[in-house]
Regions:
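Fe(II)/2-oxoglutarate
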Residues: 1-36, 43
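Short, compositionally biased
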Residues: 173, 215-225
């Protein structure tokens, strides 16, 4: 069943789940005008911190960083090959006159303030940039983060399951990436697919199996949240990870983006 969350009350009712949903209206207290996608692609492919994959494996994740295969290629040549790019932290390109100038002030701070105002805390919250070339896919996998996915431009199809627990029990979801392989013989009616276009937002739950097709060139932002808690409580799936490991796995992962740091800066 497709779901769209439009109010904060609905978000609070649905954030602790394993079935993805779209987000609109009051849940998104920000907007931003990004540079043309061509400019973003040309800049990111030249950045040393950018990683890349071919985007050809659908049933499992690409495991190898192939960015060096794409460096030096023209935009036109990139459009003729199979590529996806990932830049790890948008704020590193947020300086006066830079590619994402103003992003922190206009997007990241309002989003963090919204979470804080409604009882959330977190161990990490940062934004990364993604570009998918035409006719590519982000392979089947499960993230160790709660992710707000902002599809800024282009068309994607975000696939998951209507009943993730049936196909991928939590014990299996916490296995390493190499073991995350799409189940066989999944009936079409068990697949939950969202067609997403320009300026569309989707909440992708931690440990939710998913895979994403990009029929055309797309650019988007992922807000990654680790240790996300509402009124002090983790979502049940992240609590499972903590219990399994016996410790908090987020402590050393971007600690400068933790809510205690953000709250101090927003006073």
């Amino acid at each position: 069943m497709h779901k769209t969350v439009a109010t904060t009350a609905e978000f609070l009712d649905n954030w602790d789940s394993r079935v993805n949903f779209l987000m609109v209206e009051e849940c998104l207290p920000f907007s931003f005008e990004f540079p043309p996608t061509k400019q973003i692609v040309e800049r990111l492919v030249a950045e040393q911190k950018t990683t890349g994959i071919t985007g050809r494996l659908r049933n499992t994740s690409d495991g190898e960083n192939t960015i060096e295969d794409f460096r030096g290629m023209s935009f036109a040549d990139l459009m003729e090959t199979s590529f996806q790019l990932r830049y790890p932290d948008v704020t590193m390109l947020d300086h006066p006159g830079d590619l994402f100038a103003g992003f922190t002030e206009r997007v990241l701070i309002p989003w963090k303030r919204y979470l804080l105002d409604h009882g959330f805390e977190w161990d990490r919250c940062y934004a990364l940039a993604r570009v998918s070339g035409p006719n590519t896919c982000t392979g089947y996998h499960m993230d160790r983060s709660n992710v707000l996915f902002w599809n800024v431009r282009g068309r994607k199809v975000f696939h998951g399951f209507h009943d993730p627990d049936r196909w991928v029990p939590l014990e299996q979801a916490t296995a390493g990436r190499e073991a995350q392989i799409m189940p066989e013989n999944v009936p079409d009616e068990d697949v939950l697919s969202y067609e997403i276009g320009d300026n569309t937002f989707l909440w992708n739950h931690l440990l939710t199996p998913h895979w994403v097709d990009a029929p055309e060139l797309t650019f988007g932002i992922n807000f990654s949240h680790g240790g996300l808690r509402h009124n002090g409580r983790l979502c049940r799936y992240e609590q499972h990870v903590y219990d399994m490991l016996g410790h908090n796995p987020n402590v050393q992962w971007h600690p400068e983006t933790a809510s205690r740091v953000s709250a101090a800066g927003l006073k």
